[in-house]
Amino acid sequence: MEDRVLIKNDVTELIGNTPMVYLNKIVDGCVARIAAKLEMMEPCSSIKDRIAYSMIKDAEDKGLITPGKSTLIEATGGNTGIGLASIGASRGYKVILLMPSTMSLERRIILRALGAEVHLTDISIGIKGQLEKAKEILSKTPGGYIPHQFINPENPEIHYRTTGPEIWRDSAGKVDILVAGVGTGGTVTGTGKFLKEKNKDIKVCVVEPSESAVLSGGKPGPHLIQGIGSGEIPANLDLSIVDEIIQVTGEEAIETTKLLAIKEGLLVGISSGASAAAALKVAKRPENVGKLIVVIFPSGGERYLSTELFESVRYEAENLPVE
C-alpha cells in the first residue's frame, strides 16, 4: 500500500466536509428522521468559515486584494467575522470588523485573539447602519476591501458548490426536506438550489424568529436568536426556492438548544436550536412519515456561554464548592 500524506497545507483546507448525525433522543412523536449537519466541526466552529474563505479567494483571484497588503472590512454578527479573522491571520490580512454590541462576549474575545480590530455598533442602526460605518472606515483605509457578505454572490455560490453536494452525497440522495435558518440567506439559497436541481420534490424550509418575522411579512424586532433574523430580507436570499417559512420563539430555541446538549451530546449555538425546533415540528407531521429531514446546525455552543442560553448552568459553575 502506498503511503499518503494527509496533512493539510493550511487552515483553509480544513473547511467543509462536515459530518451529519441522526438525532435520537429528542425526537419523541416524530414520524420522520432528522439528520443534523454539524457545521461546528469547521476550523472556527461555524458555517461562516465557508463563505469567509470563498469571498477572500474570489477577491484574490480578481486582483481586488493582496495578501500582506490589503485590509478586510466587514459588518458581521460575529461568525463571518471570526472566519475572516482566522483566514486573514493565515494569509496576512489586517481585519476590521463592525459587530452589534448585543453579540456575545465570546465573539469579541475570539475576534481579538485572532488579531481582528473590532468596532461595536448600537443594535438600533441595523445592518444598513453597520454597512455605512464600514464604508466610512473604508474611505480612510488605503487598500481596504469590503466583502459584503449580504450581497456577495460567492456567499450562496460556495454553498451550491460544497454544502449542497455534501448533503446529497452523505444522505445517498435520500434527503427529502432541508431546514435552515436565515441570516445572510446564502446557506439556504445555495444549498437549496443544488438540492432542488438534484430532486425537484425536495422541500426547503427556512427558520426565522417569531419576534422578528420579517420573511413572513411581519415587522422587525428584538429577539434572542443570534445569527438569524437580521430585520430585513437579505439580498442573497432567493425566496423562489423556499417552500415554507417556520417561526420559532426565542424560548423555543433556548429550550431546544439545551435539550440537544443534555440529551444528544451536541453543544450548539442558539440558531442551531431554533432550526432543530423547526425540524421537530416538520418531523411530527403525518404527511412526512418515513422521510429524511436534514437540518443545518450553523455553529457550536462555546461562543454563547455568556448569554441567556447558558445562564443557569453558568451560575451553577461559578458557585461550585471546592472540596
Curated annotation (Swiss-Prot):
One of its GO terms (molecular function) is cystathionine gamma-lyase activity. Pathway: Amino-acid biosynthesis; L-cysteine biosynthesis; L-cysteine from L-serine: step 2/2. Coiled coil: none annotated. Keywords: Amino-acid biosynthesis, Cysteine biosynthesis, Cytoplasm, Lyase, Pyridoxal phosphate, Transferase. Disruption phenotype: No visible phenotype. Light early-flowering and premature leaf senescence phenotype. Increased total cysteine content and increased resistance to pathogens. The modification N6-(pyridoxal phosphate)lysine is found at residue 48. CDD domains: CBS_like (cd01561). It comes from the Eukaryota. It catalyses: L,L-cystathionine + H2O = 2-oxobutanoate + L-cysteine + NH4(+); O-acetyl-L-serine + hydrogen sulfide = L-cysteine + acetate. It holds the Pfam family PALP. Its cofactor is pyridoxal 5'-phosphate. GO terms for cellular component: cytoplasm. Its main location: cytoplasm. It is found in: Cytoplasm. Its EC number is 2.5.1.47, 4.4.1.1. Inhibited by aminooxyacetate. One of its GO terms (biological process) is response to oxidative stress. Pyridoxal 5'-phosphate binds at residues 79, 183-187, 271. Involved in maintaining Cys homeostasis through the desulfuration of L-cysteine. Modulates the generation of the signaling molecule sulfide in plant cytosol. Probably unable to interact with SAT and to form the decameric Cys synthase complex (CSC) and is therefore not an enzymatically true OASTL protein. Homodimer. Belongs to the cysteine synthase/cystathionine beta-synthase family. This is Bifunctional cystathionine gamma-lyase/cysteine synthase.
